[in-house]
């Protein structure tokens, strides 16, 4: 017997914020947990859609690359430069 599954529609704004907050705190390295987690806790709620899209894209990046960008060991891609500078403060 097939069990009916609820239809899933577009992600709600609230769910998106929760998902992004979780991804910020549950990274592959503790260093990035401690950098991205507090940032997400304090900033996500005030971001517009474009800023959320950019931060969401940043969360898809490799932790080792992110750490090198935030610590100044490597230059970030241009699209992330301002966000990385804000994270590094």
Please describe what each predicted stretch is.
Residues 2-89:
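Positively charged, polar, low-complexity stretches
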């Amino acid at each position: 017997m097939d069990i009916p599954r609820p239809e899933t529609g577009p992600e709600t704004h609230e769910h998106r914020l929760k998902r992004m907050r979780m991804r910020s705190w549950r990274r592959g390295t503790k260093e990035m947990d401690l950098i991205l987690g507090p940032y997400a806790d304090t900033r996500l709620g005030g971001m517009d859609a474009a800023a959320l899209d950019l931060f969401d894209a940043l969360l898809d990046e490799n932790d080792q690359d992110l750490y090198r960008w935030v610590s100044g060991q490597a230059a970030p891609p241009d699209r992330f430069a301002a966000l990385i500078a804000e994270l590094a403060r």
